[in-house]
Swiss-Prot record:
One Pfam family of this chain: EF-hand_5
Residues that bind Ca(2+) 1: D74, D76, S78, T80, E85
Family of this protein: Belongs to the recoverin family.
Encoding gene per record: cbpM
UniProt name for this protein: Calcium-binding protein M
GO cellular component terms attached to this protein's record: phagocytic vesicle
Taxonomic superkingdom: Eukaryota
Native source organism of the sequence: Dictyostelium discoideum (Social amoeba)
Signal sequence extent: none
Length: 183
């Protein structure tokens, strides 16, 4: 990612418009924001720039979760997020279906890429949910009770593991889960 990527061409805007949920005008506006936060002007965000960009949009979102988002959307594992990767991220987060959002979140927390959320991975997701719930003014005790019941419902086979299928199927049925996951 070098200086050659620091300008967005008309064909880039058209490509992103066709491959995201954004209009050409929205792509151009997002690009203007992107340039403001691309402090070194190299046409991509490093981790710090990415976090600052998202903090400007989601000030209460925990930084460690923004770092997880960075890892999830760094599709080429270059430790940078170029504009196309950013628009995919924003498209899913902002305009994606509940299923798209749940898939991304599952992938973020399934660190070992096993297709199963193990207890440690579920505990990390629960911590995020508690933070979001508290930031929405809910009591920690009420959130904890809701989350425990929700995860009991999601874990259909009661093996204390949550498969991708269980998470997507039950998660899509729970608007409260989506809210507590910050999506």
């Amino acid at each position: 990612m070098g200086q050659q990527n620091s300008k967005l061409t008309k064909s880039d805007i058209e490509f992103i418009g066709k491959n995201s949920n954004f209009s050409k005008e929205e792509v151009a506006n997002i690009y203007g924001e992107f340039k403001k936060f691309d402090k070194d002007g190299n046409g991509s965000f490093d981790r710090k720039e990415f976090v600052l960009f998202f903090k400007s949009k989601l000030p209460n979102y925990p930084e460690d979760n923004l770092n997880k988002l960075f890892d999830a959307f760094d599709s080429d594992k270059s430790n940078t997020i170029d504009f196309k990767e950013l628009t995919v991220a924003l498209s899913i987060i902002g305009k994606g279906s509940a299923e798209d959002k749940l898939k991304v979140l599952f992938d973020i927390y399934d660190k070992d890429k096993s297709g199963i959320l193990e207890k440690k991975e579920v505990d990390e997701m629960i911590a995020l949910m508690k933070n979001v719930g508290v930031s929405l003014g809910k009591s920690p005790g009420d959130i904890e009770l809701f989350i425990v019941k929700l995860f009991e419902k999601i874990d259909k086979d009661k093996n204390n593991l949550i498969s991708r299928e269980e998470f997507l199927t039950e998660g899509a049925r729970s608007p409260s889960l989506l809210t507590l996951l910050g999506i």
